Amino acid sequence: MAKMSKQARAREFNAASRQIIKERDLYQCIFCRMEYHMEDVSWYGQQLQSIMHYIPRSRGGLGIPQNGALGCQSHHEMLDNGNKGRREEMLQIFKQYLQDHYPDWSEEALTYSKWKQCIYKFVYTKRRNYESTN
């Protein structure tokens, strides 16, 4: 199996992030909980759940809780495909949901940047070293 690049790893939700998202979202699709267009949701589609990216991986969206929410297969497909003409409305609902949970939420912080990662690693390492010496 080929090793994933740092960028590819950063865009995937790891086990810890997935667990945080599931607990935050009460193990339910965020759109099903608000009964969003349930006429287009099948029982089977509700049973299959996955983590949805607000900013997609294809646009550098990170695999962090601030960029994800739990979605059933039906709503996830509705969001990704936009075939019902509801994508923009769903993105607004998704954005508001994330802002409600993370007061300092911003779209800029949700995308991968090699330089952001370097700065974060530098600051985190310095802080960790400082805390371990004091």
Spans of model-derived segments:
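Histidine-centered nuclease catalytic patch
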Residues: 31-70, 85-90
